[in-house]
């Protein structure tokens, strides 16, 4: 099945790209520049495409992102420290981000005669991000069947939607994902901060999967305290 992967350059989507390359016919990686402060992630997506020998396209939607105000990922708002399961992390929501990206990706896939679009949403995202939940994935697929009716039949693949990030790490290891060549941190500095929600989740995922984390963190121990606090 000819598959186009939406790839941010993060651990989840790069692992997904390696999985799709092994299980399907990977036709390319599609990334989005929406004005995110951690734009350096796109360099890791480019490196992934080169490694897998497929085209990489970056869609510039910064003018759209500029209208989706109030998120710590795009605006001058501090990225909070802590676990994703905390209410404070809702400031990292970019309204309809996945929906917007998927609409564009399905159009690109249809134009390129691809059979599927793959997205790396997972169970750990459900608490914070509405457009990462199973209900959204199912509804979006239904909508696209109507939107492309008579023109193309493009499937939405979300193999991790019921999985944990630890499951993704295990799957990534299975498909030899070079984890050191992925970027997660929302703060976009030279090193992973180790304190933002995505850094904490990343570090915890490696621990739970029993796989060594090759990532260099500014604060390598913060995740323990915040996960213990969450589980207390």
Swiss-Prot record:
Keywords: ATP-binding, Ligase, Metal-binding, Nucleotide-binding, Queuosine biosynthesis, Zinc. It catalyses: 7-carboxy-7-deazaguanine + NH4(+) + ATP = 7-cyano-7-deazaguanine + ADP + phosphate + H2O + H(+). The gene is queC. CDD domains: QueC-like. Catalyzes the ATP-dependent conversion of 7-carboxy-7-deazaguanine (CDG) to 7-cyano-7-deazaguanine (preQ(0)). This is 7-cyano-7-deazaguanine synthase. GO terms for molecular function: ATP binding; ligase activity, forming carbon-nitrogen bonds; zinc ion binding. The keyword Metal-binding applies. It holds the Pfam family QueC. ATP binds at residues 7-17. Belongs to the QueC family. Zn(2+) binds at residues 185, 193, 196, 199. Its EC number is 6.3.4.20. Pathway: Purine metabolism; 7-cyano-7-deazaguanine biosynthesis. It comes from the Bacteria. GO terms for biological process: queuosine biosynthetic process. Binds 1 zinc ion per subunit. It is an enzyme of class 6 (ligase). Its cofactor is Zn(2+). Gene3D superfamilies: HUPs (3.40.50.620).
């Amino acid at each position: 099945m000819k598959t186009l992967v939406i790839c941010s350059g993060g651990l989840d989507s790069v692992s997904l790209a390696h999985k799709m390359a092994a299980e399907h016919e990977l036709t390319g990686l599609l990334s989005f520049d929406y004005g995110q402060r951690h734009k350096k992630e796109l360099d890791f997506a480019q490196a992934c495409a080169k490694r897998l020998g497929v085209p990489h396209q970056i869609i510039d939607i910064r003018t759209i992102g500029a209208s989706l105000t109030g998120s710590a990922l795009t605006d001058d708002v501090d990225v909070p420290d802590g676990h994703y399961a905390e209410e404070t992390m809702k400031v990292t929501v970019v309204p309809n981000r996945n929906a917007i990206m998927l609409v564009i990706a399905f159009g690109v896939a249809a134009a390129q005669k691809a059979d599927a679009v793959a997205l790396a949403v997972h169970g750990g995202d459900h608490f914070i991000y509405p457009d990462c939940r199973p209900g959204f994935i199912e509804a979006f697929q239904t909508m696209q069947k109507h939107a492309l009716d008579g023109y193309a039949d493009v499937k939405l693949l979300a193999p991790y939607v019921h999985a944990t990030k630890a499951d993704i790490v295990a799957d990534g290891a299975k498909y030899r994902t070079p984890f050191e060549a992925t970027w997660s941190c929302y703060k976009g500095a030279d090193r992973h901060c180790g304190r933002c929600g995505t850094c904490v989740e990343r570090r915890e995922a490696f621990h739970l999967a029993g796989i060594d984390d090759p990532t260099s963190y500014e604060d390598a121990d913060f995740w323990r305290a915040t996960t213990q606090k969450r589980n207390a």
